[in-house]
Amino acid sequence: MANNVLNRYLFEDLSVRGELVQLDEAYQRIISSKEYPAAVQKLLGELLVSTTLLTATLKFEGSITIQLQGDGPVSLAVINGDHNQQVRGVARWEGDIADDASLHEMMGKGYLVITIEPKKGERYQGVVGLEGENLTEVLEGYFANSEQLKTRLWIRTGEFEGKPHAAGMLIQVIPDGTGSPDDFEHLEQLTNTVKDEELFGLEANDLLYRLYNQDKVRVYEPQPVAFHCGCSRERSGAAIITVEKAEIYDILAEVGSVSLHCDYCGTTYTFDETEVTELYTQASGGNKTLH
């Protein structure tokens, strides 16, 4: 089947749009960077699905970050995605977390932050409390309050054919459409019947036909979704020289090198004293170049 793909579709006679995302490798890359507890893996999968679905609603080049913050065992869980559906994510937690821990058991008292950053134009940030039993309900509340467009989400994570999968669907009323509330309710009822194994295992066209074969559905060209971190040795070197020089050389004197670790992909970049000196020489306008 086609996985790591987002499909957009339109109910031509009902003034409702939809999205379907099916992920395996992109999800697996994110949860393999650390030894995340099972419940945190699930939460990251839900955030990943949510971010890809919301990013697909962008009508411009830019990115969306969906972030959970709280005072519970999980202090942070965040996924970032852009208009090219390049995604990355990370979570921070302390202590033991039960496999079946709920959103509120993990996050405690917290909130959801959605940040939209166009390449051109103003940055937008929305903050909502964790009102709801799960992430799906929190996001639907966000849509109700901010977009004021009737929106429903279905988000699933789990094992399929021995590997972690994450998938989801979104349906949303088209502004100024000619459809009736009954149309949306009709599609809600149909989508409520979707099973995990269908989301994880069926091709998009087969799944959409299974759900909506009585309706006229136009499916657009699929868009691939891929893990992309964006870290590099060059960026790590640039970060080092923003730190007080004396502090960096104290570290070098103590351990012989300076290392930066990327939380998103798990890569560690290590610089010895010669390389650090070259970084500072380059930054001060010297002729030496770091390779």
Curated annotation (Swiss-Prot):
- PTM section of the record: Under oxidizing conditions two disulfide bonds are formed involving the reactive cysteines. Under reducing conditions zinc is bound to the reactive cysteines and the protein is inactive.
Which GO terms fall under molecular function for this chain's record? protein folding chaperone; unfolded protein binding
Q: Which InterPro entries match?
A: Heat_shock_Hsp33, Heat_shock_Hsp33_C, Heat_shock_Hsp33_N, Hsp33_helix_hairpin_bin_dom_sf
GO CC terms, sorted: cytoplasm
Q: Which UniProt keywords apply?
A: Chaperone, Cytoplasm, Disulfide bond, Redox-active center, Zinc
Could you tell me the Gene Ontology terms of the biological process aspect for this record? protein refolding
Report disulfide bridges, numbered on this chain. 229-231, 262-265
Q: Where in the cell is it found?
A: Cytoplasm
Q: Which family does it belong to?
A: Belongs to the HSP33 family.
Q: What biological function has been recorded for the protein in this entry?
A: Redox regulated molecular chaperone. Protects both thermally unfolding and oxidatively damaged proteins from irreversible aggregation. Plays an important role in the bacterial defense system toward oxidative stress.
Protein name in UniProt: 33 kDa chaperonin
Q: What organism is listed for this UniProt entry?
A: Vibrio parahaemolyticus serotype O3:K6 (strain RIMD 2210633)
Gene name linked to the record? hslO
